[in-house]
């Protein structure tokens, strides 16, 4: 993977689901609602001074959100940050940089 270029879209893994779960409360606070369903479906990663993860998350039968999560470098010891998100996405909406 090239520094700065997002990876190809990949199926979500247990690690990606765990990351999505860790920022779920940040999204719920920003949206002022709870998401009983929160299933990571696919993701892209981008190496920066740390790592950006673009994660497609299913929040209802036909409703998805796209998350951009920043993971700092290990020696910085900082928590995961929900940098940005997009709501009202469908299963077929492509994950792109936002």
Swiss-Prot record:
Its main location: cytoplasm. A motif (Secondary area of contact) lies at residues 46-50. GO terms for molecular function: cysteine-type endopeptidase inhibitor activity; protease binding. One of its GO terms (cellular component) is nucleolus. The keyword Nucleotidyltransferase does not apply. One of its GO terms (biological process) is amyloid fibril formation. It comes from the Eukaryota. Keywords: Acetylation, Cytoplasm, Protease inhibitor, Thiol protease inhibitor. The record marks 4 as: Reactive site. It is found in: Cytoplasm. The keyword Secreted does not apply. It holds the Pfam family Cystatin. The modification N-acetylmethionine is found at residue 1. This is an intracellular thiol proteinase inhibitor. Belongs to the cystatin family. This is Cystatin-B. It comes from Sus scrofa (Pig). The gene is CSTB.
